[in-house]
């Protein structure tokens, strides 16, 4: 099965996102998105980008793109920011709620980035975020380190290719483990009898109509 994944470089255009010194979040987001996308494409994934240039889109437009192309997954790339310089470090992955394959994928991405040296801040539910709430497929938002953390920026810059590969590998690994949920069946009791012959007589009715019957005591 060829999966279709929408990759979103957060912010863009007139919305720079978080800014630290000469660094703009929108630029980091776009660069990482394109590298991750190339790795996924090389592994047979149909990748759709919300943007490949420095343009502005509302979160609603980003979600609309994912819905219109019928994506199987939506992944948005961001950098975090703290009130004070070097106050916090680490990565976190945001999802609508902690359930399903999106939760598994988020945990895999978080763990993969942790192995590179980023502090793991955990997978968190953020149902209020538009790109997580308005998308009709499993959606994740990755906060790849704090843009105003010197240690995070150093790790981000020195291991940019490794960071992209870690994210892409975690995504691909989750997809390879994806299973189809088994359908749910309900048991229907047609009667309870003291005499065996009455039970046998009743049992013939659904059998004649093609339904399997399993007698129990």
Region spans (language model):
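Generic anion/oxyanion-binding catalytic loop in active/binding sites
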Residues: 18, 55, 188
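Solvent-exposed beta-strand motifs enriched in subsets of small alpha/beta binding domains
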Residues: 180-217
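Short glycine-centered, acidic/aromatic-flanked micro-motifs in structured strand/loop junctions
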Residues: 9, 51-52, 95, 190-192
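Active-site beta-loop-alpha junctions enriched in small/polar residues
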Residues: 12, 80, 193
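Active-site-proximal helix/loop segments of hydrolytic enzymes
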Residues: 2-4, 23-181, 200
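Short glycine-rich His-centered loop
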Residues: 3-22
């Amino acid at each position: 099965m060829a999966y279709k994944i929408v990759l979103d470089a957060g912010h863009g255009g007139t919305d720079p996102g978080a800014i630290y010194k000469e660094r703009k979040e929108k630029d980091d987001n776009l660069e990482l998105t394109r590298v991750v996308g190339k790795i996924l494409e090389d592994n047979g994934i149909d990748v759709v980008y919300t943007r490949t240039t420095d343009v502005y889109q509302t979160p609603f437009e980003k979600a609309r793109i994912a819905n219109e192309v019928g994506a199987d997954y939506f992944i948005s790339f961001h950098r975090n920011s703290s009130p004070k310089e070097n106050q916090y470090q680490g990565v976190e992955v945001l999802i609508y709620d902690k359930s399903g394959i999106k939760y598994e994928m988020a945990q895999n991405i978080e763990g993969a980035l942790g192995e590179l040296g980023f502090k793991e801040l955990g997978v968190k539910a953020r149902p209020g975020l538009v790109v997580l709430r308005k998308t009709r497929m499993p959606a994740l938002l990755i906060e790849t380190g704090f843009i105003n953390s010197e240690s995070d920026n150093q790790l981000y810059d020195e291991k940019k290719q490794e960071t992209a590969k870690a994210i892409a590998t975690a995504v691909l690994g989750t997809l390879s483990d994806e299973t189809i949920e088994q359908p749910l069946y309900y048991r229907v009791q047609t009667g309870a009898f003291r005499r065996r012959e009455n039970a046998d007589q009743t049992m013939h009715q659904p059998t004649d109509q093609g339904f399997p019957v399993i007698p129990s005591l």
